């Protein structure tokens, strides 16, 4: 995968560059990302997680082939060349089937890998760190690595079978907190030690050799570690470079390896840039993008309520809250406290569990009505200034059309701009 290997090669030669991975399946988030990459002439890495997308449909209802088609059709409609698009699979392994015995869970993981690779995903994160129903807790490095090597062999065979060659790029390892933000309130976070990182690498190298996969080791281009960044519902742990100094030095001894940092959402622009400089050259972002989407929609709903009588309004926020209460499975094990605390978390939490509800038909109908209501007449500038002040500046400067969709996309792109600046050292254009 030339874009990723070129990035790693340049980084290892001393360039403080990187790439960000957009981890979302929301159409407006993906449109924002594709348009931003197109305007700035950069490749775009879009990743699906094993929770979102799997051979059975995941929580999005999409298989890997469905997700590929969805993203590629969107890219085509926006004039973005598919040659600049990189698809990645995140946390691929037995994650979805931890409640099953390891034999069954890994059989499902084999099929998961086949479905991702056959669909043309080229960046494959092998994560077998989770214990299955009959496993010890925690798993040893050796077991984790053996299972990852097994999946790598499946991936290589599938790629050869479907494409006549294998150009897959692999990521191994995992961060300590769960994917997508911590479940509980954060108190302290341990940075991965150099010793633990080396142990993960060596265990995987040995397991790959046992599977006869020595030749693909140079294509293991990233190791997931915990650099000391995380967020929960109301707090952010900011990157502290001094705590990751030894870890950062350790990766310099490997020829074609950088770190991949998960849960970088809500870090400051300065922290994102420093992460890249410290060799955390792949930055994952997801909830921060849907958080920005939610912010923009809540702002537009407030504008709608100022402009229209209640009976004509979309009632987006009311519909959203009602559906979340009727179907609490995506938030009830994450948000705690009294009724008011949970209500606030449902709407405003950094962990953004609301992102699981946007595809709901009732909520989508309310969203479409909101957009229609505000598209009929120009939105008064003072209301844009009140509720979307950053977009107001762009509207006033003639850089942004004040339509509902463009205001939403611009707000999401404000987050993407921070990641672009961190990875490319420059700030270019929203589009």
From Swiss-Prot:
It comes from the Bacteria. Forms a complex with KbaY. The gene is kbaZ. This is D-tagatose-1,6-bisphosphate aldolase subunit KbaZ. HAMAP family: Tagatose_aldol_KbaZ (MF_01295). Component of the tagatose-1,6-bisphosphate aldolase KbaYZ that is required for full activity and stability of the Y subunit. Could have a chaperone-like function for the proper and stable folding of KbaY. When expressed alone, KbaZ does not show any aldolase activity. Pfam families: GatZ_KbaZ-like. Belongs to the GatZ/KbaZ family. KbaZ subfamily. Pathway: Carbohydrate metabolism; D-tagatose 6-phosphate degradation; D-glyceraldehyde 3-phosphate and glycerone phosphate from D-tagatose 6-phosphate: step 2/2. One of its GO terms (biological process) is carbohydrate metabolic process. One of its GO terms (cellular component) is plasma membrane.
């Amino acid at each position: 995968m030339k874009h990723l290997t070129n990035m790693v090669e340049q980084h290892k030669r001393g360039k403080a560059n990187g790439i960000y991975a957009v981890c979302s399946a929301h159409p407006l988030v993906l449109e924002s990302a594709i348009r931003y990459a197109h305007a700035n002439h950069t490749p775009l890495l879009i990743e699906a997680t094993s929770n979102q997308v799997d051979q059975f449909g995941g929580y999005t209802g999409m298989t890997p082939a469905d997700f590929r088609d969805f993203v590629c059709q969107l890219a085509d409609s926006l004039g973005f060349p598919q040659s600049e698009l990189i698809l990645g699979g995140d946390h691929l392994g037995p994650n979805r089937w931890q409640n099953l015995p390891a034999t069954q869970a890994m059989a499902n993981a084999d099929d998961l890998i086949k479905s991702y690779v056959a669909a043309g995903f080229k960046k494959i994160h092998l994560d077998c760190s989770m214990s299955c129903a009959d496993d010890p807790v925690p798993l040893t490095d050796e077991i984790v690595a053996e299972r990852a090597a097994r999946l790598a062999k499946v991936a290589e065979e599938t790629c050869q079978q479907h494409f006549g060659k294998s150009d897959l790029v692999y990521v191994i390892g995992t961060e300590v907190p769960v994917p997508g933000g911590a479940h509980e309130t954060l108190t302290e976070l341990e940075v991965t030690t150099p010793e633990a990182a080396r142990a993960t690498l060596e265990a995987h190298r040995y397991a790959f050799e046992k599977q006869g996969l020595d030749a693909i080791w140079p294509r293991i281009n990233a190791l997931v570690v915990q650099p000391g960044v995380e967020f929960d519902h109301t707090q952010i742990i900011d990157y502290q470079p001094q705590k990751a100094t030894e870890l950062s030095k350790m990766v310099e001894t490997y020829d074609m390896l950088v770190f991949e940092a998960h849960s970088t959402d809500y870090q400051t622009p300065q922290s994102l840039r420093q992460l890249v400089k410290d060799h955390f050259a792949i930055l994952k972002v997801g909830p921060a993008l849907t958080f920005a989407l939610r912010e923009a929609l809540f702002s537009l709903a407030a504008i709608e309520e100022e402009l229209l009588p209640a009976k004509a309004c979309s009632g987006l926020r009311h519909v959203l809250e009602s559906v979340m209460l009727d179907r609490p499975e995506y938030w009830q094990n994450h948000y705690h406290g009294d009724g008011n605390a949970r209500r606030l978390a449902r709407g405003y939490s950094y962990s953004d569990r609301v992102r699981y509800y946007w595809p709901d038909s009732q909520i989508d109908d309310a969203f479409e009505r909101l957009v229609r209501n505000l598209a009929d007449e120009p939105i008064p500038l003072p209301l844009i200034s009140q509720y979307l002040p950053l977009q107001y500046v762009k509207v006033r400067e003639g850089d942004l059309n004040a339509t509902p969709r463009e205001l939403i996309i611009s707000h999401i792109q404000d987050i993407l701009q921070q990641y672009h600046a961190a990875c490319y050292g420059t700030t270019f254009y929203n589009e």
